[in-house]
Amino acid sequence: MPRPTSPHPDAERKSASPLHPRNRHLGRYDFPRLIAGSPELERFVILNPYGRQSIDFADPAAVKAFNRALLQQFYDVREWDIPDGYLCPPIPGRADYLHYLADLLGASHDGLIPRGPGLRALDVGTGANCIYPLLGHHEYGWRFVGADIDPQSLASAAAILAANPRFAAAIELRRQPDRRQIFQGLIGVDERFDMTLCNPPFHASLDEATRGSRRKWKNLGKLDPTRTLPLLNFGGQGAELYCEGGEAAFLAGMAEESRAFATQVFWFTTLVSKASNLPNLQERLKTLGASDIRVVDMAQGQKQSRFVAWTYLDKKQRRAWRKERWTAALLEPLGE
């Protein structure tokens, strides 16, 4: 019999703000079906105060088992695993970024979403979980380059791909050798990407990340001074959680570097966790000469999020890009 537990914001997320209409995780989780596909999940299942099956989202082991079950059931990803302490992302929210990104491409292509291997995406900071390339290739058939500065993250991602040959054929992993750079050293001279995506480090230091974790646990009523706390709800290593100057500095650096690749990328995009960082980023992009800057709002349960997208291509350049790279793609009308 699952044991009862206190509520968690993610546990009832589906009764709050909706996910993207194409998100596979609309509706409530079917735990019996998840357990049938991944029996190891059963020992982590609990009853929430509403009498429904859930897991303790503050338990990294439970979240990892839950993610493994979701990835196997919905995305045909086998033997997914990450080292202890690495970021274990919430799958529905990561999928939403990709679906809204597909909408952005569709809005740039007469309402038709381009699918298939002709489109290439660069995932900056792919992490040990390799989550965006896995979901993006499954949902839209895009090819990905997953980049990271951490060798252990890339080794973990490589192990996932080795267990999933179908994905490995479409996903290339690259190491960024210089942690001070983002696009430099990753994008080749004649290389083109239809989109970039990124989940930037949120904090400015390990101490700040730990304080943020303690605040979240206190709000959940779970703060136990004798317990070793995972960083945030889903773990995470240094480069995944913090960088010098925090999110604002990272976004500023990304904006500056993007200018050098203005004609090699159609849409640059990045998540922005702190809404207060939006005005400076938008102003900087205008100064750098971006021809189109968009803020795409998203919502997963009680959490509000957004990503910023920008391009330096003018209308003529965009038409030429679409004609050269997207006309042969499989096309899907927006809203389907």
From Swiss-Prot:
Any single Gene Ontology cellular-component annotation: cytoplasm
Keyword Acyltransferase included in the entry's annotation: no
Domain of life of the native organism: Bacteria
Keywords on record: Cytoplasm, Methyltransferase, rRNA processing, S-adenosyl-L-methionine, Transferase
InterPro entries linked: METTL16/RlmF (IPR010286), rRNA_lsu_MeTfrase_F (IPR016909), SAM-dependent_MTases_sf (IPR029063)
Catalytic reactions of this protein: adenosine(1618) in 23S rRNA + S-adenosyl-L-methionine = N(6)-methyladenosine(1618) in 23S rRNA + S-adenosyl-L-homocysteine + H(+)
Residue stretches spanning the membrane: none
E.C. code: 2.1.1.181
Localization (cell): Cytoplasm
Gene3D superfamilies xrefs: Vaccinia Virus protein VP39 (3.40.50.150)
The keyword Thylakoid is annotated on this UniProt entry: no
Matches recorded under CDD domains: AdoMet_MTases
Annotated GO biological process: rRNA base methylation
Region annotation (Disordered) ranges: 1-24
Pfam families per record: Methyltransf_10 (PF05971)
HAMAP family linked to this entry: 23SrRNA_methyltr_F (MF_01848)
Described function: Specifically methylates the adenine in position 1618 of 23S rRNA.
PANTHER family: RNA N6-ADENOSINE-METHYLTRANSFERASE METTL16 (PTHR13393:SF0), SAM-DEPENDENT METHYLTRANSFERASE (PTHR13393)
Protein family membership: Belongs to the methyltransferase superfamily. METTL16/RlmF family.
Name the UniProt record assigns to this protein: Ribosomal RNA large subunit methyltransferase F
Gene giving rise to this polypeptide: rlmF
